[in-house]
Amino acid sequence: VKATGGTTVYFAGVTAAPPYHYHPHRPEEFDTLPRDLPAQTRMALENLKKSLEAVGGTVEDVVFLQTFMTTMEGHGQAGAVRREFLGEHRPATTTMQVVRLATDPRCLIEVNAIAVVG
């Protein structure tokens, strides 16, 4: 993926959790998380979309998408959610399975993204 012009914006630690939460994390903030990977994927990508919009960007501005998952159960369905989110847009992507995310043990997915806006 080659991007020219615009402003590079980095997004890190995007999960299905509420975008504004306490640090250090409070367990009760994660009580409403769905327990399946596809649903958390949808919520995390919606949070990413809101963050993109906050800086004047869109999904089409994403040039790199990095995904960490704590389970591969539901991976195919999560991939379908990602394809729905991206539409015809194809940024560079990578997906890795990890033992646990630092946010909360109930978080199953975390996304980092790089976008070139403008």
Region annotations inferred by a language model:
Residues 1-118:
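Short, polar/acidic, helix-capping and beta-turn segments at strand->helix junctions
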